[in-house]
């Protein structure tokens, strides 16, 4: 028995080392490639360096200009990054739209930024990049646990080559949210409910959609106990940590005198709460009427594609992952933008990590692998360029 336990520990250690090595390969490849691409784009097509409230909203942050600093750092001073930096340095604006952003990421930026000499952009990028690396390791471990190592290897590449994957390397919440979400589900599958609850809480303090982790975690907890109430223990309370994060944020906003979330979205983000099918129908109608911008078309296509993958997830993966995908999509579709109906969905679908596991399963076939990789890489290059040039992507 001791020999078997020792062997199991050694094999687990080797597997973890393999996960780290492979994650580093993917991370370094993507980091160098996209940084080089961003630098080349700005070198070939310099953009105006003066802030513009509509075209280049730096929100009071001084643009990084000139030399390698602009090519390596200034290229990532874009859109939501500026909101996070503003919150980190000046706090929430009582009459501004940035109060819809949960506090964990900007607070982390503030703490690390102060520790490294008030270099807040470097802090923001460091946090998101470390989270991206950690997310890759956990995605590999989770997929290997559920399937096999080759599928795990492909899943890391597929999510990293997705057309909007550059957001995982930017100063955005995509990577931290995915890290906490995958960790919550990974720990739940292993029955480590206290740790799973902590990760779910952190996820909901990073992104509002983290609250829906309650549903897959509750299902997984009940399934592990054969859906029999006599098998329930106090550890089951950990599944409530995800909505606790959202409720805490709502209470924080209330006592600080901010408008309710719904009003803030309506006034500052031109977004209204709707039933999920309403936003999808409105986006579809806009497309059929020929009024969709290119970004809108991409958002719509990705939504339909990931809805399809959600259906497949219920058939090919443990049910907890299908529930996670379904509830997340319903949450994301519960708002509609007056200008771009599904605004940001091409970015938001990155959080649907089980979809990339499904693609990795399909990618066992060499032709399917090429059909996934080639279009993804081409779109990734194009959309990264759009982002760097202050073009709206999501």
Outline where the language-model segments fall.
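Transmembrane-helix signature of polytopic, membrane-embedded enzymes
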Residues: 119-123, 139-161, 179, 320-323
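Membrane-lumen/periplasm interface segments of specific transmembrane helices
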Residues: 33-51, 76, 202-203, 210, ...
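Signature aromatic-anchored transmembrane alpha helix within multi-pass, membrane-resident enzymes
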Residues: 239-243, 365-394
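Specific aromatic-rich, kink-prone transmembrane helix
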Residues: 138-141, 158-161, 176-195, 355
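Transmembrane and membrane-interface helices of multi-pass
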Residues: 143-147, 151-164, 168-171, 185-189, ...
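Short acidic/glycine- and proline-prone juxtamembrane loop motifs at membrane-interface regions
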Residues: 169-176, 345
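Short hydrophobic/aromatic helix or loop-helix immediately within or flanking a transmembrane segment
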Residues: 75-118
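Transmembrane-helix motifs of polytopic, lipid-linked glycan transferases
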Residues: 110-111, 123-146, 307-312
């Amino acid at each position: 028995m001791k020999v078997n336990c020792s062997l199991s520990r050694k094999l687990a250690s080797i597997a973890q080392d393999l996960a780290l090595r492979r994650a580093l390969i993917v991370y370094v490849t993507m980091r160098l490639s996209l940084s080089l691409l961003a630098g080349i784009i700005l070198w070939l097509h310099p953009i105006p360096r003066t802030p513009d409230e509509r075209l280049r909203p730096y929100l009071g942050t001084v643009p990084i200009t000139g030399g390698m600093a602009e090519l390596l750092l200034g290229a990532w001073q874009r859109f939501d990054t500026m909101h996070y930096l503003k919150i980190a340095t000046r706090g929430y604006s009582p009459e501004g739209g940035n109060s819809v952003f949960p506090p964990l990421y900007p607070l982390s930026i503030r703490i690390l930024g102060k520790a490294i000499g008030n270099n807040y952009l470097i802090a923001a990028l460091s946090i998101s990049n470390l989270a991206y690396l950690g997310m890759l390791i956990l995605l590999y471990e989770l997929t290997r646990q559920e399937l096999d190592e080759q599928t795990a290897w492909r899943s890391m590449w597929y999510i990293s080559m997705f057309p909007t994957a550059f957001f995982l390397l930017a100063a955005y919440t995509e990577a931290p949210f995915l890290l906490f979400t995958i960790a919550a589900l990974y720990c739940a599958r292993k029955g480590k409910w206290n740790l799973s609850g902590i990760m779910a809480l952190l996820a909901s303090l990073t992104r509002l959609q983290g609250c829906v982790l309650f549903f897959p975690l509750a299902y997984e907890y009940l399934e592990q106990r054969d859906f029999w109430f006599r098998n329930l223990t106090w550890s089951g309370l950990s599944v409530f940590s995800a909505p606790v994060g959202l409720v805490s944020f709502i209470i924080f906003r209330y006592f600080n005198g901010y408008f309710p979330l719904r009003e803030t979205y309506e006034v500052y983000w031109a977004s209204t709460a709707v039933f999920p099918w309403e936003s999808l129908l409105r986006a579809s109608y806009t497309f059929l009427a020929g009024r969709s911008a290119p970004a809108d078309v991409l958002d719509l296509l990705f939504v339909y594609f990931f809805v399809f993958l959600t259906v497949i997830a219920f058939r090919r993966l443990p049910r907890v992952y299908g529930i996670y995908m379904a509830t997340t999509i319903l949450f994301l579709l519960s708002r509609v933008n007056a200008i771009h109906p599904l605004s940001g969905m091409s970015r938001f679908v990155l959080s649907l990590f089980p979809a990339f596991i499904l693609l990795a399963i399909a990618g066992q076939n060499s032709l399917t692998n090429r059909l996934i990789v080639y279009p993804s890489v081409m779109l990734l290059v194009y959309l990264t360029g759009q982002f760097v040039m202050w073009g709206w992507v999501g």
